[in-house]
């Protein structure tokens, strides 16, 4: 019986040691792997009038998506049917936008500028490198940033997604 207890104790100690050693394992992320995340995004919401509405985002690998709503031609200066699109943007073009935003103090802005009592003003929701700003009422003037993003959108060769993928 004593040998059985010693064997079980030794077995239990080995299991505990293995369990603790696996908790200390650290994953090496220095291999250059970058998780995909939104580098630049801009969404403009509808209003009761003819405000352009769309939702654009580009990942840090250059993969871009665009959902076109009503009156979007006003924003990009070109006609795109309402629907969903994909495209690719060169990384240096993305960097131009993110660097401009960072130099302009974008990362120091509040997250939300809004007044729920004001209804007929469209919102502009922008994202630059994990920082998102909801700008609808009495917020900072980000028209220059929005214009740069909208110009970028206008230069992409968008591919419309078929209805089955929407």
Model-inferred region functions:
Residues 58-62, 87-96, 128-131:
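A short, structured loop/turn motif at beta-sheet edges
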Residues 1-21:
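Sec-dependent bacterial lipoprotein signal peptides
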Residues 13, 51, 80-82:
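Short, solvent-exposed coil/turn segments
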Residues 39-75:
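N-terminal secretory signal peptides
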């Amino acid at each position: 019986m004593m040998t059985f207890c010693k064997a079980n104790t030794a077995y239990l100690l080995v299991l505990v040691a293995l369990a603790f050693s696996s908790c200390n394992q650290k994953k090496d992320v220095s291999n250059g792997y970058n998780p995909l995340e939104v580098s630049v995004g801009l969404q403009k919401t509808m209003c009761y009038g003819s405000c352009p509405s769309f939702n654009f985002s580009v990942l840090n690998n250059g993969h871009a998506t665009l959902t076109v709503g009503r009156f979007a031609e006003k924003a990009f200066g070109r006609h795109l049917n309402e629907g969903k699109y994909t495209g690719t943007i060169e990384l240096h073009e993305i960097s131009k936008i993110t660097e401009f935003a960072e130099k302009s103090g974008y990362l120091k802005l509040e997250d939300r500028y809004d007044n729920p009592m004001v209804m007929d003003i469209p919102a502009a929701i922008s994202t630059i490198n994990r920082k998102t700003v909801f700008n609808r009422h009495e917020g900072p003037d980000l028209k220059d940033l929005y214009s740069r993003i909208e110009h970028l959108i206008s230069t992409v060769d968008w591919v419309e997604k078929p209805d089955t993928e929407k």
